[in-house]
Amino acid sequence: MRASRSSGPSAHPGHAGHAGHGGPPAPIAGTYITEVKLPAIVDYILAAKRAAGALGLVVGFSLQEIDELNIAVTQACENAIAAANEQWGRGNGQLKLLFKTQPRRLEVEVRSVPPRAVEMQQAVRPARRDEAVDYESVGVNMIRLFVDELRYHRDQQTGIMRMRMVKYLIE
C-alpha cells in the first residue's frame, strides 16, 4: 500500500486517535491518496475491504458506514475481476484501487488493469461470459445503495473497467 499527501493543512501529532485517547479517531484534516494494487482474484477482495475499512476509520465513519463501504468495495472489486477475466483470462489482470481521503469523505476508485507481462496479454484469450443475467448491472445498482456518488465506465476497446465511488461522513 502506498500513501501520499496531496494537499491540505498539516497533520497534528496524535491526531488520528491513537491508543490512549479513549474514543474514536478524530477525522483527518488534509487530503491523502492511497494506492493498492492486487491480483484480479476473488481471494484478494479481503485486502481491498481491509484497506477501505481502515481508511473509513481515518475519515471518521461509523461501523455501519464502514460496513456499507465494504459492501460497495466488494461489489466493485467483483465487477472489476469479472471484467479482467473477460478481457485477459482468469487470474491474469490486476485491480488498482485509489483511495482519496478528505475531511468528511472518502473517494474510492476501483479499476481493472491489464497484466504486466506483454507476452501474457498476447497469449491469453478473453474468457467467455455464458451467464444470461447481467450481473454487472445488478452489481452497479447494488453499489448505488451504499455510496453517495457513483460513476462507472467500461472501455469497450481495452476492456478496462473503472468505478469511482464517494461516501460522505454524515453526523
Regions found by a protein language model. Give the residues of each.
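Generic detector of contiguous secondary-structure segments
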Residues: A52-D67, N92-K100
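Generic hydrophobic secondary-structure packing signal
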Residues: Y44-A48, A52, E68, A72, ...
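Helix-loop-beta hinge of the Bergerat
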Residues: A29-L63
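Conserved ATP-binding N-box helix of the HATPase_c
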Residues: L63-R90
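Conserved beta-strand-loop-beta-strand hairpin that lines the nucleotide-binding pocket
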Residues: M1-E35, I81-E171
